[in-house]
Regions:
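N-terminal signal-anchor module of multipass membrane proteins
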Residues: 1-12, 20
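Short amphipathic alpha-helical coupling elements at transmembrane boundaries
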Residues: 12-23, 48, 52, 132-139, ...
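Alpha-helical transmembrane segments in multi-pass membrane proteins
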Residues: 15, 35, 39, 93, ...
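Alpha-helical membrane segments and immediately flanking helix-loop junctions
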Residues: 21-85, 183-234
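Membrane-core helix-loop-helix motifs of multi-pass transport proteins
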Residues: 55-110, 230-255
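Juxtamembrane boundary at the C-terminal end of a transmembrane helix
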Residues: 255-263
């Protein structure tokens, strides 16, 4: 789809918005929509592809990565809300917070370059599009699956060796239940496992929504590794990407809190 005329049409339509908000081309809007539809790490992959094809600069790519590293509705509503917490309402609250958090987060990392690239159009490659797409998809699936398996194995070992005992002990002194602490720490490493553990703690709906929103927007180190395999192509330091994910997580959790208080 990245090679079709649909992308060029979307780019032209979204240029006024993305240029005004983030000082990047309209193609950033396409990356954003693909990311919120497909989830991690699609946004990172498309951003890296655009940079490698010289459609965006390194500075623009760094800005785009701040608001296009997102989860998708299938995971948020289907897996987390319905599958783990048995609550559709929770899913919609988290999804809205997650998307708004990403949009706001992008403003914090607005491109500061002089940019007149918002009218870029994507050029169709001369190679076989089907072959390239199939190859890229297979590599992406293997990459994602590999990091998930490795992260799950590392987390299982850490839990088995009780390596979270120290932070659990520290937070317990502030009245925080050990199961909640363990769930959050697990989610920071592998988000799906952490959220599943959180759903079994029996905490309130409001607290579940806020913590889940934070963890999903942060993504977990497993997702960080997946995304960074692509993002490093335009010299984005991991420390900068980590900062982007932390601010996204804080903003999303804050938006979740506001939504809960209002509605």
């Amino acid at each position: 789809m990245s090679y079709t005329a649909i992308v060029n049409s979307a780019t032209k339509f979204l240029s006024p918005f993305t240029h005004r908000l983030y000082n990047v081309g309209g193609v950033a809007g396409y990356v954003f929509f693909m990311s919120i539809i497909s989830g991690y790490p699609i946004g990172a992959k498309i951003t890296a592809d655009l940079y490698q094809n010289k459609q965006i600069t390194s500075g623009q790519a760094k800005t785009i990565s701040a608001f296009t590293s997102t989860s998708g509705p299938l995971f948020i509503i289907g897996t987390v809300a319905v599958g783990f917490f048995q609550s559709h309402r929770l899913g919609f609250i988290i999804l809205i917070s997650h998307i708004l958090g990403a949009i706001i987060n992008g403003l914090l990392y607005r491109n500061k370059e002089n940019s007149n690239t918002h009218n870029y159009t994507l050029q169709s490659p001369t190679q076989n599009i089907l072959n390239d797409s199939m190859y890229s998809s297979i590599i992406s699936i293997m990459l994602v699956g590999g990091f998930i398996a490795i992260s799950y194995m590392i987390l299982s070992i850490m839990l088995h060796l009780n390596l979270f005992s120290l932070p659990i002990s520290i937070f317990s002194k502030f009245g925080i239940d050990k199961n909640i602490t363990s769930s959050i720490l697990s989610g920071i490493i592998e988000v799906t496992t952490g959220l599943n553990m959180l759903s079994k703690t029996g905490i309130s709906f409001n607290l579940s929504a806020i913590i889940s929103s934070f963890l999903i927007s942060f993504g977990g180190l497993s997702i960080h590794a997946q995304a960074y395999c692509y993002l490093k192509s335009f010299n984005l330091k991991y420390s900068h990407f980590l900062k982007q994910k932390i601010t996204h997580a804080i903003i999303s959790a804050s938006v979740t809190f506001i939504i809960i208080m209002i509605f």
